[in-house]
């Protein structure tokens, strides 16, 4: 839209184009459920975080798959976002979501984009599964997720946020968004909340909520682990 002065010269201009946001499939590289479980290894020795560094032994533990993401025809970029999850930067440390120009989120754990797509992948898969069982009303909304959050603390949290839920995954120790157990545990607090809004405030209910979140997270991780342990 052009706004002209009385003499016919340009005063200002507005871009009124409305660019479509299109869901599409993108190739992703993730852990299933983490790099140690498929190896039947415990944390220690060479199997440590090492300040987010990638390691040769990890290369075989990345899984290639595909998941729904958003393509913006205006920017020509792909965003780690779909109808269920939106990766965003809510808390410190600052890490803007990755936005590649091709439908491929192929990062390793030394890059911030890995946690972004790892969280989106597992939350989407888990929600798709419970929806297939007929519970499609649970968390039938878009949760905003920060995969580098909690001000660097070794902690993660689901926040009801007045009906606009968020999940913040901490980066202390091993980044929590690298581990499907933690990803799904926090998301399941949202599932419980959506099943009974405002009903999980009491101490007893909160304790039960933690147990349920652990159960579903463990069940999910076992289901995607080739060794089933």
Locate the predicted segments by residue.
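Zymogen propeptides/activation segments of proteases
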Residues: 1-183, 190-229
């Amino acid at each position: 839209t052009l706004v002209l002065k009385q003499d016919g010269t340009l005063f200002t201009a507005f871009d009124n184009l409305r660019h479509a946001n299109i869901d599409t499939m993108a190739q992703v590289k993730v852990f299933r459920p983490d790099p140690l479980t498929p190896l039947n290894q415990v944390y220690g020795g060479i199997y440590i975080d090492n300040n987010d560094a990638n390691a040769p032994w990890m290369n075989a533990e990345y899984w290639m798959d595909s998941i729904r993401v958003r393509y913006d025809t205006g920017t020509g970029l792909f965003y780690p976002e779909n109808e269920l999850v939106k990766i965003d930067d809510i808390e410190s440390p600052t890490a803007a979501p990755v936005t590649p120009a091709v439908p491929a989120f192929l990062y390793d754990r030394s890059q911030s984009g890995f946690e972004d797509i790892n969280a989106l992948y597992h939350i989407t898969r888990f929600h798709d599964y419970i929806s297939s069982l007929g519970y499609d009303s649970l968390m039938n909304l878009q949760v905003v997720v920060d995969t580098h959050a909690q001000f660097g603390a070794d902690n993660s949290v689901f926040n009801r946020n007045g009906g606009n839920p968020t999940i913040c995954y901490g980066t202390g120790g091993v980044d929590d968004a690298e581990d499907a157990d933690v990803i799904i545990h926090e998301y399941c607090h949202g599932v419980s909340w959506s099943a009974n809004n405002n009903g999980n405030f009491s101490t007893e209910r909160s304790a039960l909520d933690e147990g349920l979140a652990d159960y579903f997270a463990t069940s999910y991780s076992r289901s995607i682990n080739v060794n089933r342990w």
